[in-house]
Amino acid sequence: VIGGVDSLEVGRFNELTSEEDEFSRRLARNQQIILKEESHFDKVVDPAGGSYYIENLTQELANQAWKYMQELEAEGGILNALQEGKIHTDIEKVANARKEAMRKRKDVYVGINLYANPDENPPTQIQIPRESNPIKMEVLKAGALPQLRVVEEIENLRTRVIKSDKNRNIFLMNMGTINDYRVRADFATGFFQAGGFTVISPQGFMTVEDAVKSAKESNAAAYCICSTDEKYNELVPAICSALPDSFLILAGYPKDKVESFKENGIKMFIYMGADVVATLDELAKKLGVENEA
């Protein structure tokens, strides 16, 4: 609307999980109508005029699009690019980069790879019949352009874990004062909840004995130690010795201690920049969650 488009299609919020209904269709439609009819964006020649943010991004988008079109023309045009698979390859490169950013949480998708709702039930996806186009195009020999959703991997993992009948409780062994464990406990909670795991986060423990006792009583499938790097030097060997047969995770990645901590019995590390999908998928498999729920 702000850009002056002649037509616009906005997807329904539930288009992946249900057939079209009046409520979702109305919401998708009315967002743009409100901008036009109530905010009167269509009455102004250039609503975004003077906005460096919008104008700069618009110019950058136009420049990159024009550069890409020239590149396609130099290689024989868009039809040839489709037939040769160039466009498919370019889309795959962008998709892989976006997936990598999502997996390492450089790109945040609220409610999915960060701040996931632990009480949310996964929606039931349905197969919605679509009308097929009888027109056969020569270009389709190259294969259809893929429809990709960046968060699909982690959504599938989360659904798999939630639907599984395996124990998915993770007990946080918060050690020391609240200043010692709070940051990493919050990080660990968000990390595990993104994969559908249930987090048990008690108050801090001042002794290893108390932490081990509570951990055993929690009946959790795995335990995650949360504290400072300095305290880990004493805590990790002691906790690993007290829980030799347990799946122990460490919140953090002290590079100079990783190998020795592994020897002590730490099975997994979670930290900023870790691949959340790969890490949680490995955890799910270790806990017995099957690939297909």
Briefly describe each language-model feature range.
Residues 237-293:
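Peripheral docking tails and interdomain loops at the edges
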Residues 2, 8-13, 75, 82, ...:
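Generic beta-strand/beta-sheet core signal
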Residues 37, 164, 169-225, 235-242:
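Generic long, charged, amphipathic alpha-helical segments
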Residues 6, 67-170:
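Intrinsic disorder at enzyme termini
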Residues 1-69:
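Mobile "lid/hinge" segments at catalytic clefts and subdomain interfaces of large enzymes
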Residues 18-28, 53-68, 87-102, 180-186, ...:
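Short glycine/threonine-rich loop-to-helix capping motif typified by GTGT followed
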Residues 11, 43, 54, 62-86, ...:
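Phosphate/diphosphate-binding loops
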